[in-house]
UniProtKB/Swiss-Prot annotation:
It comes from Vibrio campbellii (strain ATCC BAA-1116). Belongs to the heat shock protein 70 family. Chaperone involved in the maturation of iron-sulfur cluster-containing proteins. Has a low intrinsic ATPase activity which is markedly stimulated by HscB. The gene is hscA. SUPFAM superfamilies: Actin-like ATPase domain, Heat shock protein 70kD (HSP70), C-terminal subdomain, Heat shock protein 70kD (HSP70), peptide-binding domain. This is Chaperone protein HscA homolog. Signal peptide: none annotated. NCBIfam families: HscA (TIGR01991), PRK05183.1 (NF003520). Pfam families: HSP70. GO terms for biological process: iron-sulfur cluster assembly. GO terms for molecular function: ATP binding; ATP hydrolysis activity; ATP-dependent protein folding chaperone; unfolded protein binding. Keywords: ATP-binding, Chaperone, Nucleotide-binding. It comes from the Bacteria.
């Protein structure tokens, strides 16, 4: 009897081979897919040997074309040929029309305000268009690798917001792809260069694509990538170079706006071809609808110089945020096809004081980094020494008096990371402190998830507020959290380890984030009330302790009775629900006890100076 070999989904048909995974660079202008094969990460090509797939989809009545075939239809069918859909994903129609008023597409608005593109094949939204691009890349990967993909890593610009990231994941789901992770494009480039060149030190990743610009300042050390700062512009890229040159050519040719959609697309194609030619030529001859002329690289560079300067302003801000000087940067990594523009390389080189690094194809570096990470996330490198970059999905905080949450590490912080904060004691003579670690976005402990508790003992007895306890939260690249509490004067410390993400599904994380937004106003009101109650308790306890210590000596019976009434009034307010009333009660109590506090101060000064001469002071 013949035996049929059935491969497990996500595995190749040959036994003992790794799971199949791919990294996808879903770009504004072009997209690529890469995978690790025989230990090397390489981009995967189509049947004509091309690694790049133009991010273009053409919708005919019965068929959808993707890539080069679709791009060829752009001039004849601009309304049915969707280009740079990445700019549209996650945005409302109103936002799109304000940002890109000259798009040739026929839009209509959906019930929830999202854009619908009207094509010959019917209505399409940006997620569906993106899905068609992803489907084409997924098919290429499966045909090349010879099996079903276990999952993919898709790269996104660092500045993509939640809606844009969610739209990208939805597009992948629609394309039938399992998303292992969304990865920031500059981070993907750092992964590729970190493995290939083994750099250590501060690296700047300058990523100028077709539609977006990102700058990331990274520290690379022993296989660990630490993100120091990011910046950029989600609406600036090589497409803008094309538009500026197209406007210039239109002016030189004496054409009047607006052009028809077909002519507009043709003009952009001429501008793009001219821009590419400037990488090798100083002067390019052009033919714009019968007008023949020449454009020099110097003229082109003067047009785009303000945009390149704008990117360098973002670089300057990112360096400032990272507390790093430009001369401290070891390498400037160039990513994105638009970095082939000579002026970009020259100005970036001048800014950082060194020749930019371009040893990996700038079009492919992001996809290669994504492919490397996909291979690891699929479980193909269990012993890999590379520490994966990730972000903390929910904030990590500590419980303070009154059941409040003080956030130590905010959500979306890249790991590995360490943050510290100082706290103090609440009561006189306090010798121990309970450290309660929580996870979540809400303001009150009861609304967050408890992770761990431990106690720091051996704090020297002091007056309230005198002790200094430094609490450090450290999350390593595996998501393992270490919490350390140390009393600074004695060095006594305690610590605990916990895995923050354990037991939380994506849905639970999403629900916690949703609740933090839904109850934001109520949470802030509850926090304000709790803070005032804590302050009231401090004032009440302090005043009672002072009266017990010095009341009989410094206060008359009537004064003691008056202060007792003030304390009772504050206690009543403290037990109420009005934060403003408690705040006013605290002010009234401080005012009523001011004279008593002055007498105690005088007494302390007299005691300190007792028996001393003027020469001793």
């Amino acid at each position: 009897m013949a035996l049929l070999q059935i491969a497990e989904p996500g595995q190749s048909s040959a036994p003992h081979e790794h799971k199949l995974a791919a990294g996808i660079d879903l770009g504004t202008t072009n997209s690529l897919v890469a995978s690790v094969r025989s230990g090397d990460a390489k981009t995967l090509t189509d049947d004509q040997g091309r690694s790049i797939l133009p991010s273009v989809v053409n919708y005919a009545q019965d068929t959808a074309l993707v890539g080069y075939e679709a791009k060829a239809k752009a001039e004849q069918e601009p309304e049915n040929t969707i280009i740079s859909v990445k700019r549209l994903i996650g945005r409302s129609l109103k936002d799109i029309q304000a940002r890109y008023p000259s798009l040739p597409y026929q839009f209509k608005e959906s019930d929830n305000g999202l854009p619908i593109l009207q094509t010959a094949q019917g209505d399409k939204n940006p997620i569906e268009v993106s899905a068609d691009i992803l489907k084409s890349l997924g098919k290429r990967a499966e045909e090349t690798l010879g099996g079903e993909l276990a999952g993919v890593v898709i790269t996104v610009p660092a500045y993509f917001d939640d809606a844009q990231r969610a739209g990208t994941k939805d597009a992948a789901k629609l394309a039938g792809l399992h998303v292992l992770r969304l990865l920031n494009e500059p981070t993907a480039a750092a992964i590729a260069y970190g493995l290939d060149s083994g750099q250590e030190g501060v690296i700047a990743v300058y990523d100028l694509g077709g539609g977006t610009f990102d700058i990331s300042i990274l520290r690379l050390s022993k296989g660990v990538f630490e993100v120091l700062a990011t910046g950029g512009d989600s609406a600036l890229g090589g497409d803008d170079f094309d538009h500026l040159l197209a406007d210039y050519l239109m002016e030189q040719a004496g054409l009047e706006a607006p052009l028809s959609a077909e002519k507009n697309r043709a003009l952009l194609n001429i501008a793009t071809a001219t821009k590419i030619a400037f990488s090798e030529q100083d002067c390019v001859d052009v033919d714009v609808f019968g007008w023949k002329g020449a454009v020099t690289r110097e003229q082109f560079e003067e047009l785009i110089r303000p945009l390149v300067k704008k990117t360098l302003m973002s670089c300057r801000r990112a360096l400032k945020d990272a507390d790093v000087d430009a001369e401290d940067v070891l390498e400037a990594v160039m990513v994105g096809g638009s970095t082939r523009t000579l002026l970009v390389r020259e100005m970036v080189g001048e800014f950082f004081g060194r020749t930019p690094l371009t040893s990996i194809n700038p079009d492919e570096v992001v996809a290669i980094g994504a492919g490397i990470q996909a291979d690891i996330l699929a479980g193909n490198k269990p012993d890999s020494e590379m520490l994966l970059l990730d972000v903390i999905p929910l904030s990590l905080g500590i419980e303070t008096m009154g059941g409040l949450v003080e956030k130590i590490i905010p959500r979306n912080t890249t790991i590995p990371v360490a943050r510290a904060q100082e706290f103090t004691t609440f009561k006189d003579g306090q010798t121990a402190m309970s450290v309660h670690t929580v996870q979540g976005e809400r303001e009150m402990v009861d609304d967050c998830r408890s992770l761990a508790r431990f106690s720091l003992k051996g704090i020297p007895p002091m007056v309230a507020g005198a002790a200094h306890i430094r609490v450090t939260y450290q999350v390593d690249a595996d998501g393992l959290l270490s919490v350390t509490a140390m009393e600074k004067s004695t060095g006594v410390q305690a610590e605990i380890q916990v895995k923050p993400s354990y037991g939380l599904s994506d849905d639970e994380v999403a629900n916690m984030l949703r609740d933090s937004m839904t109850y934001a106003k109520e949470d802030m009101q509850a926090r304000a009330l709790a803070e005032q109650r804590v302050e009231a308790d401090r004032v009440i306890e302090g005043l009672i302790a002072a009266m017990q210590a010095d009341g009989d000596e410094l206060l008359s019976d009537q004064e003691k009775q008056d202060l007792v009434k003030v304390i009772e009034a504050l206690i009543e307010l403290r037990n109420g629900e009005d934060a403003d009333a408690i705040e006013q009660g605290i002010k009234d109590t401080d005012k009523a006890s001011q004279d008593f506090a002055s007498r105690r101060m005088d007494k302390s000064i007299r005691a300190a100076l007792s028996g001393q001469s003027v020469n001793d002071i």
